[in-house]
Amino acid sequence: MGSGTTLVEAKLLGRNAVGIDINPQSVSISETNLQFHCDTSSKIYIREGNAAELHFIKDAYIDFICTHPPYADIIKYSEGIEGDISMLGVKSFIDAMDKVAYEAYRVLKKGKMCAVMILSLIHI
């Protein structure tokens, strides 16, 4: 979720959205960035949590997933937060992303799309 830019755009477009971030500071920044009035009926939900543990979302419930996971241990997004995959080396990061992909597949409606924005790890 980072600073909530995708959630802000969803709100402006009248879309419902769920933002999840493991870092409480990112959650707080996103909440602040979403404190504006907009003449739409969108519902924006923000939650501190792990993208590999989406137990609070029903199976086949989400229409579109847009995710921008960290780049393994290239950029540290937090200090000492359990489950933060930005703290992991490449091999462990890929293993953790497998769990994220499984949960994304579970919550995504059949025939819908998931966009994963990530850099190539080939040259790392």
What do the predicted segments below correspond to?
Residues 1-122:
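Class I S-adenosyl-L-methionine-dependent methyltransferase catalytic core
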